[in-house]
């Protein structure tokens, strides 16, 4: 007998919560994996200098794409709340207007990225040997920013529409497109970093255009795309509510730039390459926490809108325990896989492999607390409290990490760079706990 579909209005057990969030977890993990494929192909088929070049400009690319996460997560919280209040038609209009806004903003940012890439590469500290790869890869990828943003927006809205499995299908289709084209353009056609960039851009078109077609046509989801005029208030509300996700993205990117600057100063290109490997693996591991946060957010928003306080308590209690179990599991897994994963990326260079493996074994302790911090920030976004969510993200991903990256190398040498993220997660854990306690009476989740 087939299992009944899960509704936002349901009471959630551990099993039902995992079943509902699993598609978004898989979606985020798969998105991270196919992003990692770029790094694997560039490192193994093009070389470590082009690999370092790609990693150097990646933070800027992610900042632009992060606008889509802001609109998607903030907009989903708003639309899910409207659905919980029974305002179906207003939810349709708001959803449609936010998709239109994403397209327009994405087109503008694509143009900005293409025009400013040489200056951006210089600002990020690219060496003369890295400059051509930085500019070529960066210009091509940022040209597809509109598609990247759409893909990020629809990842969240598929969940609010009660179609998380369809969202997973679209992500898998985009991922397979990227992997196949990477192999074709880099390994067969020998197009180098340009091939990696084109493969990524075309896969983002798949991830952004397929959902657009689905929501434009008659469908069985909770949401429809309809003609809509831009309205400032819901745009600002969505952007403000999703600002924590944008802040997290921007902060991570800025901190990535700071990491690269410190590593170029202390080690050189090998340090940037080693950090690139850590980031690719972190993308996959942290994607599990982000996917859970994205998947559970519409449920929290719905029950908040419906004033189901007992269900909010249930969701918070179960989620905190799941994040703790996930943190321990991923930390152990990262310790075990440090050497094999390092070998997969940079096994062709003995000294770089040794550096990466050592860094990995220090860096991996950050996974213990990352899940709790990511979920707490997303939880407040789902409660339509963008200010608290943004504060947690800002402190966690920028203030604490930047401070640690600057201070710890003075105390611990190069190892201080690899310990920095763990120190930041410890401080963020304290702040997240304080906010949960302070806001408990307002939202009745404890």
Task: Please name every model-derived segment.
Residues 33-51, 121-128, 184-191, 253-280, ...:
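Helix-terminus/linker motif at the lipid-water interface of multi-pass membrane proteins
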Residues 63-66, 178-183, 208-212, 283-287, ...:
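Hydrophobic transmembrane alpha-helices of multi-pass small-molecule transporters
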